[in-house]
């Protein structure tokens, strides 16, 4: 027995060394309230003592951090970090993430359950099913831009053995939303990219979401959700709902009761396919399922880390508030907003978070950054068309105005603006404005879609300019004949031919 007593400290030290995670950082801090080290020395640390933290260990379920104090190596309990005032100036971005991890709720969870590998394996199975419910947005330029932002915010994984490898993926949805997966995959919606209006706002949101991943929030929440429906049954239900709500593009109908409405078109040119998206009808269920229905405390923890990262990057300290304000305003004009309970909305604690960040009534975020609007233009264009097809005309106009004001509009934007004006106005002045935009589109477009001639014809008819309408309908028919035969093309040619015959008879 006595030999065991002699050997036990050595065995414990060996086990601790195995748990020691060699970090590359020295995190300086100043003691602000007296406490003692957690090693056998139990040294008293008075206020003003300088401490440099490095590796952490988990010893008998307790988080311990190695510290250099007055040239001596000591151990500090993770529960005593609240007595330290961290000195972050001069630290690398990685070091700041490591310091934030040490101060977060993740360290306590790690000491109790390790990396929760069993839960993570179960979550990975859920992610495979989740991937089947979304459509990824294809824009290589945008993907590369987001990767550059990620490297600024999160250059590498600072916590050794952390299972997450950060990646950003864009999915199609009009709703401003994100899904921060425990494996490091961060899904961000086209609707959110369209809602934000500066790179710094995007950085703030991404930093906040990375914090959720880094601090294992979804893993913790998923573990607590003991009443989970069987995986196959749940995702089968989600896919059924998704199939019903994602058919946002109307089936092509060239003739409806003898008349034609361009609103019945797929949505011109590049938007002729059904658009699959994760709608608000199922986003809440999915977030809850995957452990991403965060508590207010988890949101606040992630918010504080985002603020610290933005300060470190010398970015606008109001960027997170600006981003939240834009999301809040976008939600309020959403047709789905009034039908949802607060808990069902993508950001259930959003207004409370805004207040904590200093939000006041009548607060106005700054003007949009044209460079950011240009980079994210395709996502905004996609969102605008989806909003239009859903009947959200106010939101559609907001998105179009953002594109136009930033000089980021292309043919599809001008055409959508024209269609929107016809859908919402009978004023001749609005029709004249639409015609000016269409002519500008013709001058700037790299290549013309046949539908621009159709849209110009509809505007001429609104203005009662029969000759102009006849000319553009001829142009439309000729352009259709030169293009590859697509679905419904024969019907469109037949319709425009009938229209020309009708006009020739003066009807």
Q: What spans do the regions from the language model cover?
A:
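Zn2+-dependent metallopeptidase catalytic core
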Residues: 138-161
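C-terminal capping/extension segments of zinc metalloprotease domains
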Residues: 22-30, 39-50, 54-136, 156-163, ...
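Catalytic Zn2+-binding segment of zinc metalloproteases
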Residues: 192, 197-201, 210-229
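Post-HEXXH active-site segment of zinc metalloproteases
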Residues: 218-245, 324
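Metalloprotease/metallohydrolase-associated module, dominated by Zn2+-dependent proteases
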Residues: 247-316
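Short alpha-helical catalytic segment bearing the HExxH-like zincin motif
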Residues: 187-188, 201-209, 225-226, 285, ...
């Amino acid at each position: 027995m006595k030999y065991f007593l002699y050997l036990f400290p050595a065995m414990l030290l060996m086990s601790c060394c195995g748990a020691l995670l060699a970090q590359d950082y020295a995190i300086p801090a100043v003691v602000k309230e007296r406490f003692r080290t957690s090693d056998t020395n139990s040294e008293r640390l008075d206020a003003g003592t300088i401490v440099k933290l490095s590796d952490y260990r988990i010893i008998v379920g307790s988080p311990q951090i190695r510290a250099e104090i007055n040239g001596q190596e000591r151990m500090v309990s993770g529960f005593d970090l609240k007595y330290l005032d961290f000195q972050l100036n001069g630290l690398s971005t990685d070091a700041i993430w490591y310091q934030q991890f040490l101060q977060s709720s993740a360290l306590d969870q790690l000491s109790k359950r390790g990396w929760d590998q069993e839960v993570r394996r179960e979550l990975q199975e859920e992610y495979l099913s989740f991937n089947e419910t979304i459509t990824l947005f294809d824009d290589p330029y945008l993907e590369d831009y987001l990767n550059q932002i990620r490297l600024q915010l999160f250059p590498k994984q600072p916590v050794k053995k952390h299972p997450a490898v950060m990646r950003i993926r864009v999915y199609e949805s009009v709703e401003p939303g994100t899904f921060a997966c425990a494996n490091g995959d961060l899904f961000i919606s086209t609707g959110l990219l369209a809602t934000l209006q500066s790179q710094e706002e995007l950085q703030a949101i991404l930093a906040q979401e990375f914090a959720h991943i880094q601090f294992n929030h979804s893993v913790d929440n998923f573990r607590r959700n003991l009443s989970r429906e069987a995986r196959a049954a749940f995702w089968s239900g989600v896919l059924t709902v998704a199939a019903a709500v994602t058919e946002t593009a109307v089936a092509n109908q060239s003739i409806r009761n003898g008349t034609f409405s361009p609103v019945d078109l797929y949505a011109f040119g590049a938007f002729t396919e059904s658009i699959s998206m994760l709608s608000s009808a199922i986003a809440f269920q999915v977030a809850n399922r995957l452990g991403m229905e965060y508590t207010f405390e988890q949101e606040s923890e992630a918010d504080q880390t985002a603020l610290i990262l933005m300060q470190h990057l010398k970015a606008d300290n109001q960027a997170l508030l600006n981003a939240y304000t834009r999301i809040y305003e976008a939600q309020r004009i959403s047709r789905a907003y009034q039908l949802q309970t607060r808990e069902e909305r993508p950001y259930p604690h959003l207004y409370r978070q805004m207040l904590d960040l200093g939000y006041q009534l009548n607060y106005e975020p700054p003007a949009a950054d044209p460079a950011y609007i240009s980079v994210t233009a395709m996502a905004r264009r996609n969102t605008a068309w989806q909003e239009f097809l859903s009947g959200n005309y106010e939101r559609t106009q907001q998105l179009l105005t953002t594109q136009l004001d930033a000089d980021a509009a292309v043919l599809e934007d001008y055409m959508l603006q024209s269609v929107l004006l016809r859908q919402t106005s009978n004023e001749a002045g609005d029709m004249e404005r639409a015609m000016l935009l269409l002519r500008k589109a013709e001058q700037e477009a790299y290549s013309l879609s046949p539908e621009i001639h159709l849209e110009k014809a509809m505007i001429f008819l609104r203005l009662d300019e029969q000759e102009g309408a006849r000319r553009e309908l001829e142009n439309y028919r000729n352009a259709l004949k030169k293009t590859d035969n697509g679905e419904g093309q024969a019907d469109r040619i037949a319709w425009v031919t009938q229209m020309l015959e009708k006009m020739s008879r003066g009807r």
